[in-house]
Amino acid sequence: MAKQKKHPTGTIAQNKKARHDYFIEHRFEAGLVLAGWEVKSLRASKLQLVDSYVLLKDGEAWLLGSHITPLTTASTHVIADPVRTRKLLLNARELEKLAAAVQQKGYACICLSWYWSKHLVKCEIALGKGKKEYDKRDTERERDSNRELHRAVRNKGKED
């Protein structure tokens, strides 16, 4: 059996829906408290972040909604809970900044991606302000116009 290729950037999973639903304002890097079977599953990229978000409670940050699918070979002696709440490791200054921003109306703390930093798993979290439906349409329209512009510039030299 051939080994799977590792991700070139070290990215395990991304939450693309978060970039679509929120204006990202500030990003933070957080460590995670994980069990052994979770790390083995992450090496096999068995992670889903679609509806994950960060809950700030009692001066601590907790990640909810992330789903790690357990490997059948790795978690034989442990009862694996794929959607358990996981503690995020942030310093006190970052926690205060997040708590103050989330108190404001319209702001949410969301998980953008998980990645490897040397041998550690890190979580990129962000403060985001929710987009309205017309904001999403504007973003899509802007992306389409940029694509057309780049296509026109690229094809301009080929018309000779």
From Swiss-Prot:
Primary localization class, coarse: cytoplasm
One annotated GO biological process: trans-translation
UniProt xrefs under InterPro entries: SmpB, SsrA-bd_prot, SsrA-bd_prot_CS
Any one GO molecular function term: RNA binding
GO CC, any one term: cytosol
CDD domains: SmpB
Family membership noted in the UniProt record: Belongs to the SmpB family.
Protein name per UniProt: SsrA-binding protein
